[in-house]
Amino acid sequence: MYARLSHFRWPAANTAEGIRVARELILPAFREAPGFRGLDVLIDRATGEGVGISWWVTEADAAVAGEDTALAAALANFPAVGFTFGARYTYELVVRG
């Protein structure tokens, strides 16, 4: 399994709206993507900084995450809440408890 780790930020005042967009638009779009196995979103409510970890069957699935048209359309909603992406990385899961 592979994890795609994405750093992000939005204004702390927009946290509730950012979470709503993630739950109602992003997660359903991810669920339609080939190889998708899960999504975890971690946020510091005081700063609006966070990390999204999406889980994928193969490295190739993780590599094309976000290129799917439904997912790209859902992600287009984030700029309205001041959302910006930072660095993105893909890692292989080697130990899980």
What positions do the PLM features span?
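A common structural junction motif
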Residues: 72-76
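Short S/T/G/P-rich N-terminal loop/turn motif that feeds into the first structured element of a domain
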Residues: 1-50, 57-69, 80-97
